[in-house]
Amino acid sequence: VTCDLLSFEAKGFAANHSLCAAHCLAIGRRGGSCERGVCICRR
């Protein structure tokens, strides 16, 4: 959801990746990133 919700990039900074990482941290994971529009959390 977070990857498609705010998928924009400004000066090389992708806000959707930050939101995905924050989502993953909130559920107890070690961060994450977007891959093909899907938020993938690290284990």
UniProtKB/Swiss-Prot annotation:
Name of a matching Pfam family: Defensin_2
A biological-process GO annotation: innate immune response
Statement: the UniProt record of this protein carries the keyword Signal: no
Family annotation (SMART domains): Knot1
Lineage top rank: taxon: Eukaryota
Keyword Lipoprotein: no
GO cellular component: extracellular space
Disulfide bond annotation, renumbered to this chain: 3-34, 20-39, 24-41
UniProt induction comment: By bacterial infection.
Keyword tags: Antibiotic, Antimicrobial, Defensin, Disulfide bond, Immunity, Innate immunity, Secreted
InterPro entries: Defensin_insect, Defensin_invertebrate/fungal, Scorpion_toxin-like, Scorpion_toxin-like_sf
Locations listed in the record: Secreted
Main localization of the protein described in the UniProt heading: secreted
Function: Antibacterial peptide. Affects Gram-negative bacteria including methicillin-resistant Staphylococcus aureus.
Membership in a protein family: Belongs to the invertebrate defensin family. Type 1 subfamily.
UniProt-recorded name of the protein: Defensin
Native organism: Trypoxylus dichotomus
